[in-house]
Amino acid sequence: PIITLAAGIILSYKFAGLYGVSIAAAGMMATTAMQLAIDAFGPIADNAGGIAEMSQLPSEVRGRTDNLDAVGNTTAATGKGFAIASAALTSLALFAAFVGIAGITQIDIYKADVLAGLFVGGMIPFIFSALCISAVGKAAMEMVNEVRRQFREIPGIMEYKAEPEYEKCVAISTEASIKQMILPGAIALIVPVLVGFTMGPEVLGGVLAGVTVSGVLMGIFQSNAGGAWDNAKKSFEKGVNIDGQMYYKKSEPHKASVTGDTVGDPFKDTSGPSMNILIKLMSIVSLVIAPYIAVKGDHSHATKAPVEIKVENQSASLTKATAIKLDKPTLTSLSK
């Protein structure tokens, strides 16, 4: 996938420059409808399997839903690959816009501070991913404790004589999804601002390059690895041959695969897809602050660039900030 992505970037740039890269990103975004359909397939099959098991339907029903869910995990990994590739192309286009507005002619990795920024940028996706996975684990344990409490304090749940307090479990997941994402979101927003205003636009360019490269690799790896772990767990439903011996559900290898899936699910559903958001958000924040940290001039340099007006072989030069305030007759008169 990385070689294909690199080839797409090189060919797009060769034929139409950075504009071609932007068009390539737009072209990949054109597959959004297909990606949504692919991503929706897996959760639907997974929910169908859960309903079949809770309803105590025949085992062949659960077997069919497991097969569908395994296919869903594979298609979801494919769809996430498209998403991360389009995010990489979009980030590259935003990066080019940042370089232009910030007035950078080149980013020299021989400079120690730029190289340091490159390393810091490469580290950010790992921190972001760790925080996301940790948040999932904390929320899951809170929900497990709540379920245990309900079994302990509300008699008759398993005999269908009492109704569980579903809303409390929903509240736990909702609250965790908001509160636990404050720190990862703050990292994506604050780091570009902090680096840009303290170290300058060239170092910030190094950070963005590191985030993009590391984030794309992490996103593809986590989406594929998470789907593989999930499918490995499901394969024990029919039996897995390990060194000539068949192992089924509730065996020791199956228990190990369940443990692996507790990492795989956050990989493929949380931290993997979040890499798309991270690399695009940091590029957008950098683009927003670019005029304020530009190499040439102050924060309003974009409107202070000289504009030359030519009328009847004569010309006049004034700043864009002044030019946009004048109407056409005034500009013509001024030029004359």
Q: Could you tell me what each predicted segment is?
A:
Residues P1-S315, T319, K325, K336:
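Hydrophobic, small-residue-rich transmembrane alpha-helices and their short perimembrane loops
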Residues L331-S335:
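Eukaryotic, compositionally biased intrinsically disordered regions
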